[in-house]
């Protein structure tokens, strides 16, 4: 199976997972672009290389977490549109709410959008509508089963056995709630469903678990930012070359300023969170502090001109 792991990491964790017949992608950032790579730009998921056919635009669709509505959504960008559960959505239409196990088709490529069942830390995934703010999105592993689980049949429509954990479904009745707590099996829409054992109504996770999840989230966010910086430096710098932090900040801001969540932009691309003299006039200060945490990947060089200190950065691989 061809594997595309999000965020430049080979760790199988993320906020959500895309599962096709011959590929999987772990979403490790707030927003990803699906489409096809070109000479000038790359996308997070290159569906053209995965057999998506000729009707895929460079930037065909965007899957992102909508913090206002606390849910994942699909924005259609490509002129040929996207199918979600058999319904065609075109550019200019309202963004599409994505539920776990929704079947998407872009071009000739079909795949499922899956949300996790359990947290990285082993605890149950609490009700999503009880969590607020940035921590609405926490990285998880152990996803609901993708296409063709245990069936051996060709094609992504052969989903059979999976765990069902769509707690945003307002149509669940009392009988289903009882089964959620008992660990029993029932059938839903012609498919066998396995409910995980646990409390009938989950009351959310402990403060310690939430803090641990927050820390895990920040680590994944750091990896995503570091991966983005490394990509920019490798594309724009040759062997032995350095890039001024001011220029790096400008490139990153242009490339990701409208893609990253505003809290990430504020943390790494502005000086709002850094009320200290050293950060004055340096909106890249947060980014600089992050890169200093990874000396195995980045080399920071400083030069002073009077009272002004200039920072330059390069990749270890470009200087070795």
From Swiss-Prot:
<dbReference type="GO" id="GO:0060962">
    <property type="term" value="P:regulation of ribosomal protein gene transcription by RNA polymerase II"/>
</dbReference>
<dbReference type="InterPro" id="IPR008984">
    <property type="entry name" value="SMAD_FHA_dom_sf"/>
</dbReference>
<dbReference type="InterPro" id="IPR000253">
    <property type="entry name" value="FHA_dom"/>
</dbReference>
<dbReference type="GO" id="GO:0006338">
    <property type="term" value="P:chromatin remodeling"/>
</dbReference>
<feature type="compositionally biased region" description="Acidic residues">
    <location>
        <begin position="163"/>
        <end position="178"/>
    </location>
</feature>
<feature type="domain" description="FHA">
    <location>
        <begin position="32"/>
        <end position="89"/>
    </location>
</feature>
<keyword id="KW-0539">Nucleus</keyword>
<dbReference type="InterPro" id="IPR045178">
    <property type="entry name" value="Fhl1/FHA1"/>
</dbReference>
<dbReference type="Pfam" id="PF00498">
    <property type="entry name" value="FHA"/>
</dbReference>
<feature type="region of interest" description="Disordered">
    <location>
        <begin position="138"/>
        <end position="211"/>
    </location>
</feature>
<dbReference type="GO" id="GO:0005634">
    <property type="term" value="C:nucleus"/>
</dbReference>
<dbReference type="GO" id="GO:0042393">
    <property type="term" value="F:histone binding"/>
</dbReference>
<protein>
    <recommendedName>
        <fullName>FHA domain-containing protein FHA2</fullName>
    </recommendedName>
</protein>
<feature type="compositionally biased region" description="Basic and acidic residues">
    <location>
        <begin position="198"/>
        <end position="210"/>
    </location>
</feature>
<keyword id="KW-0007">Acetylation</keyword>
<dbReference type="GO" id="GO:0048638">
    <property type="term" value="P:regulation of developmental growth"/>
</dbReference>
<comment type="function">
    <text>May play a role in the control of plant organ development and specifically in the regulation of stamen development. Does not show transactivation activity in yeast.</text>
</comment>
<dbReference type="GO" id="GO:0016587">
    <property type="term" value="C:Isw1 complex"/>
</dbReference>
<dbReference type="GO" id="GO:0080086">
    <property type="term" value="P:stamen filament development"/>
</dbReference>
<keyword id="KW-0217">Developmental protein</keyword>
<feature type="modified residue" description="N-acetylalanine">
    <location>
        <position position="2"/>
    </location>
</feature>
